[in-house]
Swiss-Prot record:
Expression tissues: High expression in brain, lower in other tissues.
Job description of the protein: Regulates the GDP/GTP exchange reaction of most Rab proteins by inhibiting the dissociation of GDP from them, and the subsequent binding of GTP to them. Promotes the dissociation of GDP-bound Rab proteins from the membrane and inhibits their activation. Promotes the dissociation of RAB1A, RAB3A, RAB5A and RAB10 from membranes.
Protein name: Rab GDP dissociation inhibitor alpha
UniProt-listed PANTHER family: RAB GDP DISSOCIATION INHIBITOR ALPHA, RAB GDP-DISSOCIATION INHIBITOR
Lineage top rank: taxon: Eukaryota
Modified residues (Phosphoserine): S427
GO molecular-function terms, A-Z: GDP-dissociation inhibitor activity; GTPase activator activity; Rab GDP-dissociation inhibitor activity; small GTPase binding
Originating gene: Gdi1
Gene Ontology annotations of biological process type: negative regulation of axonogenesis; negative regulation of protein targeting to membrane; positive regulation of axon extension; positive regulation of toll-like receptor signaling pathway; protein transport; Rab protein signal transduction; response to calcium ion; vesicle-mediated transport
Subunit structure as annotated in this protein's UniProt entry: Interacts with RHOH. Interacts with the non-phosphorylated forms of RAB1A, RAB3A, RAB5A, RAB5B, RAB5C, RAB8A, RAB8B, RAB10, RAB12, RAB35, and RAB43.
Length: 447
């Protein structure tokens, strides 16, 4: 370990593993350490089930009815991948897809007036949907056609909207869309957590709805994908990539000290040895004095013996409860997967409800979601602090990731990865460049 590295990475969460993989592909000498004996940090999948009970201090352990403990892989942080989103692009460009198998999530649902409705995924479904009345459907269809045709480089597609100055609120007004449709569009399609976006320029929202539609177009049932055996497979896939390119991995390795000289990182001390480096990447747990708390997320893992009602017996789905429907500032999310994804025993389902904490009684806040899941065999409640770095790392060369938020997709995590990459490398992350390097190594020329 007494060596000189370009980059040392602490923690094997998804953000850290992707950056470690990218840095290795870019020819950097990388040392990657984790104090835990398993991959994934905060974003790991826990197996066997006995381990999950231990983690949540449930000393009696799982009952026989839960089946074999090793049939379970339970994610601590529920997220799906947008089929056309940034993480899937990173997986494809780095060819990490060769280590993973994905399944399409069967449906996306939205909560309205105490009931859940399928988010329409085709025009036929949209016309048959009970989410809106007949005239509303026509207006909504016009709006979707406008979004689909919208091209920020072609003013002919703007229809009087200025992408940089017109607010999204004004765009909704232009198409005369009602409050329920606005809730559903902003939260189930554009995937905003709050309504702050309404008064911001409309371009980002239009692009988010496009991402949803393009992701949906790829596989049809929903825009979301989920890896067999759980999300813990993702960091391991990128860890393999890093190893192919000469990255060194050490699990179960305590970090005693991060060594600084004149305010700049020069190395990491572990078990009496020092590995030197020019740059350091880590998650917030390794540098508590360099991060600030930016809120909390509550996540309740629920084990069920039945599919969720009114989802057409789907073995995987997402439910979004827009904040307006339950008088909150932030949306509540439910991610559900099951034995079909090799993450639970036969006939069992895992549903995870999550939201940004707003009150002193977080468990009460997710009640609308839990009511949809009854009866629940077992609940595991986790309330996590969200941390973000207090500086951009330009002086110290210590680059810290942000905690995983309450959203049910990885787009915010990918933005963090691209942001850290840019601060470290001084240039924006370029997918195409990575792809070329990859092809050189595997000897596969672009067709």
């Amino acid at each position: 370990m007494d060596e000189e590295y370009d980059v040392i990475v602490l923690g094997t969460g998804l953000t850290e593993c992707i950056l470690s993989g990218i840095m290795s592909v870019n020819g950097k000498k990388v040392l990657h350490m984790d104090r835990n004996p398993y991959y994934g940090g905060e974003s790991s999948s826990i197996t066997p089930l006995e381990e999950l009970y231990k983690r949540f201090q449930l000393l009696e352990g799982p009952p026989e009815s839960m089946g074999r403990g090793r049939d379970w892989n339970v994610d601590l942080i529920p997220k799906f991948l947008m089929a056309n989103g940034q993480l899937v692009k990173m997986l494809l460009y780095t060819e990490v897809t060769r280590y993973l198998d994905f399944k399409v999530v069967e449906g996306s649902f939205v909560y309205k007036g105490g009931k859940i409705y399928k988010v329409p995924s085709t025009e036929t479904e949209a016309l048959a949907s009970n989410l809106m009345g007949m005239f509303e459907k026509r207006r909504f269809r016009k709006f979707l056609v406008f979004v689909a045709n919208f091209d920020e480089n072609d003013p002919k597609t703007f229809e009087g909207v200025d992408p940089q100055t017109t607010s999204m609120r004004d765009v909704y007004r232009k198409f005369d869309l009602g409050q329920d449709v606005i809730d559903f569009t902003g939260h189930a399609l554009a995937l905003y957590r709050t309504d702050d976006y309404l008064d911001q320029p409309c371009l980002e929202t239009i692009n988010r709805i496009k991402l949803y539609s393009e992701s949906l177009a790829r596989y049809g049932k929903s825009p979301y994908l989920y890896p067999l055996y759980g999300l813990g497979e993702l960091p391991q896939g990128f860890a393999r990539l890093s190893a192919i390119y000469g990255g060194t991995y050490m699990l179960n390795k305590p970090v005693d000290d991060i060594i600084m000289e004149n305010g700049k990182v020069v190395g990491v001390k572990s078990e009496g040895e020092v590995a030197r480096c020019k740059q350091l990447i880590c998650d917030p747990s390794y540098i508590p004095d360099r991060v600030r708390k930016a809120g909390q997320v509550i996540r309740i893992i629920c084990i069920l013996s039945h599919p969720i009602k009114n989802t057409n017996d789907a073995n995987s789905c997402q439910i979004i409860i827009p904040q307006n429907q339950v008088n909150r500032k932030s949306d509540i999310y439910v991610c559900m997967i099951s034995y079909a994804h090799n993450v639970a025993a036969q006939g069992k389902y895992i549903a995870i409800a999550s939201t940004t904490v707003e009150t002193a009684e977080p468990e009460k806040e997710v009640e609308p979601a839990l009511e949809l899941l009854e009866p629940i065999d077992q609940k595991f409640v986790a309330i996590s602090d969200l941390y973000e770095p207090i500086d951009d790392g330009s002086e110290s060369q210590v680059f810290c990731s942000c905690s995983y938020d309450a959203t049910t997709h990885f787009e915010t995590t990918c933005n963090d990865i691209k942001d850290i990459y840019k601060r470290m490398a001084g240039s924006a992350f370029d997918f195409e460049n990575m792809k070329r390097k990859q092809n050189d190594v595997f000897g596969e020329a672009d067709q």
